[in-house]
């Protein structure tokens, strides 16, 4: 098995691999600051702690496309970004974690395009940073 977005295999369909950043998904989300009251006639503050809420997590994954040629790269590139920028939350499956994460696309940058020789075959290899916002996945 491998990592997927919306049940689509990243490697098989898009020639994509997540190089780094998976470990950031394991961090527990930051707690939202609870409502508080600062009474003039009491020390400190009074906090509303009956319900706990969490912030979204902004995660940057370093990704890499590998394609047979430039036409193949552009097809995979356009198909991938069309999929992850659809309305609503998308689902990222990380095989190493055996876990789904709901997310939406924020940005992609730091593209590095190179032509590599792998076993005497030309391949297009493009690394980039993908930033997504993860919906808190807490019990």
What name fits each language-model region?
Residues 1-139:
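Extracellular/virion structural assembly segments
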């Amino acid at each position: 098995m491998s990592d997927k977005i919306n049940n689509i295999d990243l490697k098989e369909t898009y020639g994509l691999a997540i190089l780094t950043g998976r470990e950031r998904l394991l961090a527990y989300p930051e707690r939202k600051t609870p409502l508080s009251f600062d009474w003039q006639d009491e020390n400190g503050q009074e906090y509303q702690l009956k319900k706990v809420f969490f912030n979204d997590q902004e995660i940057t994954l370093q990704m890499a496309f590998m394609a047979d040629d430039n036409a193949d790269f552009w097809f995979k590139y356009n198909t991938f970004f069309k999929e992850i920028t659809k309305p609503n939350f998308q689902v990222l499956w990380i095989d190493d974690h055996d876990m789904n994460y709901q997310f939406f696309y924020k940005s992609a940058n730091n593209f590095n395009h190179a032509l590599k020789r792998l076993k005497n075959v030309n391949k297009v290899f493009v690394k980039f940073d993908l930033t997504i916002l993860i919906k808190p996945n807490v019990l």
